[in-house]
A protein has these predicted regions:
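Local cysteine-cluster metal-coordination motifs and their immediate loop/turn environment
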Residues: 127, 194-195, 216-250
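Short, surface-exposed amphipathic charged segments that create phosphate/polyanion-binding patches used
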Residues: 173-177, 225-230, 259
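SAM/dcSAM-binding transferase cores
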Residues: 246, 253-261
Length: 261
């Protein structure tokens, strides 16, 4: 876990993926060396006030955005437009300034010589992309990704959509147990909506498979001060609230108290 630092960096390139998704690329070798898969940055458009479409919804807070890619100082943030904060970010172009606090949080543990299943849903895709690049040369990987529709789907090994517009129809966890058995999986990594993560955790608990999940939570400060992102972690008999921004966002799935959300 790093000590998050505040910086301003110019956007080098903006990549349009679809009507809903885009990537902002920055360049910083020091930040690149500090980042790890599963970590995130709190980011905000420096011109947030100007870019706000409604004066009553000015995006003052930073948005927690996971690291999508990180190679030699070239850092990417894959973002979905869902509210005023991300819409303000979507209006930035090359040369515009981005405010960053990070890298923050604890990332995924990295293993070698394992059979690994990655499972992601929706905007849970970006941290998995960075993770698979770190794992692929030393492990056997299989990646399942699910989304509501075709526009939520990106490159992976197995695709699931709620509406069946591409890949298999259903929820991504529907095929999880079969893949664990077929590919003799040792470890599962996951990131996505809370119901998906809870179901994935139920499956790995039943099959006694090691499982690390990345949780998403509303954040205010993003540096562990406000405790606004705390989630219940621990055993059923002895649990406590842990901060997603500090102790997380990655936790052992078996330690997350899903029933308390």
């Amino acid at each position: 876990m790093n000590n998050p630092q505040y910086r301003q960096r110019a956007i080098q390139y903006r990549e349009e993926l679809s009507d809903d998704y885009f990537i902002l690329w920055i360049w910083d070798e020091a930040l690149g060396a500090a980042g790890r898969p599963g970590q995130f940055y709190e980011i905000r458009a420096l011109a947030s006030l100007k870019n706000a479409s409604n004066v009553n919804k000015i995006p003052k807070l930073f948005k927690p955005i996971s690291i999508y890619d990180n190679q030699g100082g070239r850092i990417g943030f894959m973002i979905k437009k869902v509210g005023e904060g991300t819409i303000a970010l979507s209006k930035l172009r090359a040369g515009d300034m981005l405010e960053l606090i990070g890298p923050a949080g604890n990332g995924f543990p990295i293993y070698r010589g394992k059979r690994i299943l990655l499972i992601s849903g929706g905007i849970g895709y970006p941290p998995m992309w960075y993770l698979q690049k770190e794992l692929i040369n030393h492990n056997q990987l299989y990646w399942m990704h699910g989304g509501a529709k075709q526009g939520d789907i990106f490159p992976c090994d197995e695709i699931w959509t709620d509406d069946g517009s591409i890949g298999r129809k259903g929820r991504v966890c529907d095929g999880m147990a079969a893949n664990i058995s077929k590919n003799e999986i040792d470890i599962v990594y996951s990131c996505g909506p809370l119901p998906m993560l809870a179901e994935a955790s139920r499956i790995t608990n039943e099959l006694e498979i090691e499982h690390y999940c990345s949780l998403e939570s509303y954040m205010a400060c993003g540096i562990g001060v406000c405790h606004g992102c705390a989630v219940p972690i621990g055993s059923k008999e002895a649990w406590d609230y842990k901060r997603v921004c500090k102790e997380g966002p990655v936790f052992k799935a078996e330690e997350v108290r899903w029933e308390l959300f």
